[in-house]
Amino acid sequence: MGKIIGIDLGTTNSCVSILENGNVKVIENAEGARTTPSIVAYANDGEILVGQSAKRQAVTNPHNTLFAVKRLIGRRFEEDVVQKDIKLVPYKIVKANNGDAWVEAAGKEMAPPQISAEVLKKMKKTAEDYLGEPVTEAVITVPAYFNDSQRQATKDAGRIAGLDVKRIINEPTAAALAYGMDKAKGDHTVIVYDLGGGTFDVSVIEIAEVDGEHQFEVLATNGDTFLGGEDFDMRLIDYLVDEFKKESGMDLKNDPLALQRLKEAAEKAKIELSSAQSTDVNLPYITADATGPKHLNVKISRAKLESLVEDLVKRTIEPCRIALKDAGIDASKIDDVILVGGQTRMPLVQKEVADFFGKEARKDVNPDEAVAMGAAIQGAVLAGDVKDVLLLDVSPLTLGIETMGGVMTALIEKNTTIPTKKSQVFSTADDNQSAVTIHVLQGERKQAAQNKSLGKFDLADIPPAPRGVPQIEVTFDIDANGILHVGAKDKATGKTQSIVIKANSGLSDEEIERMVRDAEANAEEDRKFEELAAARNQGDALVHSTRKMVADAGDKVTAEEKTAIEAAVVALEAAVKGDDKAAIDAKVEELSKVSAPVAQKMYAEQSAEQP
């Protein structure tokens, strides 16, 4: 059996990890970095770029560069947060046939799980390159406050990427696992405050020693799935746009190219201001008008940035308060505060958290890597490589059904330990009612319409009877991934109907299978493209080095040699512009052959000059 890898599929960055010889190892990607930007771009020549290469070309290709797609995963197009996002991103967010939020790039409409799958494929390949063997199984993390549709969509993304997702686990819980594995024995209660690129979670977790086993029990969780570093960047972008408008009278909001440059600059300035007191944002040629090019130069102090985002930081405190209340614990009883997510590097965030909990956060947990490390530990637990860990997570939101009068009746309360199963008996609302619709909801509001609809199904052929007589038993069953299975049974006839909640949206099995096939077909295409790109690069490099060599050689090159080399160079340049790898290889060989005598002359001369 192969290794089960741990993947932190983040809004801004992703990370992959593995447990090896009892130690957790974060795996560097092909570029040598321990985290990979969660960015996917579709280049004009059809190449799909993922990570740093996608980020680098974002400025010149803003409409086809997709970032922060995790904020759309498992969401309906009509949701307020999606409508808000449409105004903020340079790429197109569109309404799919099933009402979900999809994205459009390179003239194609795609589901968010397809985009996330590209990032997961990169993480999978990173692990395979390191291990030297195929990887087919993974534990993937999600924000603790993700609802059922978002969890299901994340699982779908794994499937499209060719991964068997063994478990979906909550990010704060994973971070606690990474933190708690090497701690001294004994019981302690920790807070994991996770402010990432797009989401915020807080979990109260009790780490206990039970019969020689490390037990991690989540007591309560809360959060906001649309609050993170991207919002902090946006505040800074808005400020820069306003400052530029005051100075030049020009609005950069309608210029996708300028916005993409501003996004990069804002992210960079925000990071710099975590260690410096001030920084300059200097963007020459940001735009132009009839009078000529315009340059943006704005000085930003740490205090200015803090004033721009203060309310966002304050917004994270209320979920902390609710989580403590739900866990029945006072802030003074918390032993350790663990900060996770890149945005927690901001001094203002650290100060607010320390003020609220009355203690400084620990500094020995890497905020970018802890979640992936915890996922790898959970993978090792599932593989049987780690025996002394028990993880007890919770369902983050209340689950129930719609009952008479549009009321939501709860079956499983929020913060219930999972896996769990609950049943309740309901009846009919009308005389001789022959069918009931089970409308499954998730949320904390009493009014059914105010909660997230997860799906509907019918239990039909109920024998005629006065209202209130039939007994319909509804069962909710949440698995260890936090994914819900619902069943309904007519107790008189024994007739049952059940569904795995796929939401009234989400991807069908057929769609996922098609996307898996597309991904497999693309893999072969990608391989050919990589080979062609490598051949082109080799050709370009040879043209450059040959021309330089001829120039350096001067009159040591005969007219005959010069003519032959120039003809071979022109032929290779023409081949490089085409799509035929074999033709490029042939012209490379030809140029190497005709330039070899000159190279030998130069080498002989250099050797003679050396003492």
From Swiss-Prot:
This is Chaperone protein DnaK. Signal peptide: none annotated. Acts as a chaperone. One of its GO terms (molecular function) is ATP-dependent protein folding chaperone. InterPro entries: ATPase_NBD, Chaperone_DnaK, Heat_shock_70_CS, HSP70_C_sf, HSP70_peptide-bd_sf, Hsp_70_fam. The modification Phosphothreonine is found at residue 199. Keywords: ATP-binding, Chaperone, Nucleotide-binding, Phosphoprotein, Stress response. Induction: By stress conditions e.g. heat shock. Pfam families: HSP70. NCBIfam families: PRK00290.1 (NF001413), PRK05183.1 (NF003520), prok_dnaK (TIGR02350). Belongs to the heat shock protein 70 family. It comes from the Bacteria.
